[in-house]
Amino acid sequence: MSKGTPSQGKHNKGSNHIICRRCGRRSYHVRKKACSACGFGASKRLKTFAWKNKKINGQRVR
């Protein structure tokens, strides 16, 4: 096994985020056990911010 820069490229396999059960987005962090989009796993309340979604026709979109 070699170490150094060539072996650092092998760290990009796999993904930390899977599909969230609550919001359906690919934002559920497997190791943290929390969704970065809706807050599932970390909070009972839905994680929402005004800056997170752009207004279209006066309505917020997901």
From Swiss-Prot:
Binds 1 zinc ion per subunit. A zinc finger (C4-type) spans 20-38. Its cofactor is Zn(2+). This is Large ribosomal subunit protein eL37. It holds the Pfam family Ribosomal_L37e. One of its GO terms (molecular function) is zinc ion binding. It comes from Methanococcus aeolicus (strain ATCC BAA-1280 / DSM 17508 / OCM 812 / Nankai-3). Zn(2+) binds at residues 20, 23, 35, 38. Binds to the 23S rRNA. SUPFAM superfamilies: Zn-binding ribosomal proteins (SSF57829). GO terms for biological process: translation. GO terms for cellular component: cytosolic large ribosomal subunit. Belongs to the eukaryotic ribosomal protein eL37 family. The gene is rpl37e. Keywords: Metal-binding, Ribonucleoprotein, Ribosomal protein, RNA-binding, rRNA-binding, Zinc, Zinc-finger. It comes from the Archaea.
